[in-house]
Structure formats: structure tokens, C-alpha cells
Amino acid sequence: MNSVFRSTARCLRSATWQYKTAHKNGELSVGRARLMCSSAGQKNLEEMVKKDKVVVFMKGTPAQPMCGFSNAVVQILRMHGVDNYASYNVLDDQDVRQGIKTFSNWPTIPQVFFNGEFVGGCDILLQMHQSGDLVEELQKLGIRSALLDQEKESK
């Protein structure tokens, strides 16, 4: 995967949150908190992200996405001919919805995983698609992008 995407994801995925508290005397105190998954929840999420070569946590289902970003991820995968992947509707389970955000240290849904490794959300997948990196990543998974066949036909 392109190192720019990895470093961007690493920078954005910090699970340490800084907060400020205002006291009655007007002073502000700063604190930090780290979000943690329970070990049972983390193990379950680890199993979920490794269920298939491509796993998507989204709002809705591939047949009926419930937000524009989830729909964009489905459409990008569909353009590449990736129709066989595990998907989880986070609207069905609040624990999964919050747990996956903590697990990946990524604040938004949808979330895409390749071979159990967090790739990113809609923005990262779109950048990978536009740059051609997604074709390469799919090849590493043993998935031939349908866009390669379209390129051959157009020549």
C-alpha cells in the first residue's frame, strides 16, 4: 500500500483524546483519555475483520447502503468486480459500531479491511482507486480488478 496512505492513517488513528475541563474558579485543566475495547469485544472484532479477504463495516448493506460514504465504498468495490466480501451493518449493533471505531482507531464509518488489516474509510479507498493503488492491493489479495479487463478491451 502506498506509504502516504499508511502514514496518513497512522496520524489520524490516534486513540488518545485530549479534553479540557472548566472549573468554577475559571481555571482550565487538560486531561487525556485512551479508549479501550474489552478483550472479549476486541477478540470478536479481530475475528470479524479476518472473516474474508475484504471486510467492510458500513451503514446499511451492499444492496441497500444507508449513507453516501458507504454507498461510495460499495460502488468502488463493484467497479473493480469485488462482489464477494464480508460486510457488517453497524446500524444493527451499537456495540459493533463503537467497537470498530476503537479497534481501528478510526472515527468514521465505513471502514475497509484487507486480510484483517485496516485500509481506511471512503476517502482512502477513493484515493487508492484514483491513483491505481487499489488495483495493486487487490492483486496482493489474489483478486483481479475488473478495471484491468476494461483497459484491455478499450485498446
Curated annotation (Swiss-Prot):
Residues 42-145 form the Glutaredoxin domain. InterPro entries: Glutaredoxin, GRX_PICOT-like, Monothiol_GRX-rel, Thioredoxin-like_sf. GO terms for biological process: hemopoiesis; iron-sulfur cluster assembly. It comes from the Eukaryota. Disruption phenotype: Lethal between 7 and 10 dpf. Embryos show hypochromia, and circulating blood cells are pale due to a defect in hemoglobin biosynthesis. Keywords: 2Fe-2S, Iron, Iron-sulfur, Metal-binding, Mitochondrion, Redox-active center, Transit peptide. One of its GO terms (molecular function) is metal ion binding. Glutathione binds at K59, R97, Q98, G99, I100, K101, I109, C122, D123. [2Fe-2S] cluster binds at C67. It holds the Pfam family Glutaredoxin. GO terms for cellular component: cytoplasm; mitochondrial matrix; mitochondrion. It is found in: Mitochondrion. Residues 1-14 form a transit peptide. Monothiol glutaredoxin involved in mitochondrial iron-sulfur (Fe/S) cluster transfer. Receives iron-sulfur clusters from scaffold protein ISCU and mediates their transfer to apoproteins, to the 4Fe/FS cluster biosynthesis machinery, or export from mitochondrion. Required for normal hemoglobin biosynthesis. Homodimer. NCBIfam families: Grx4 family monothiol glutaredoxin. This is Glutaredoxin-related protein 5, mitochondrial.
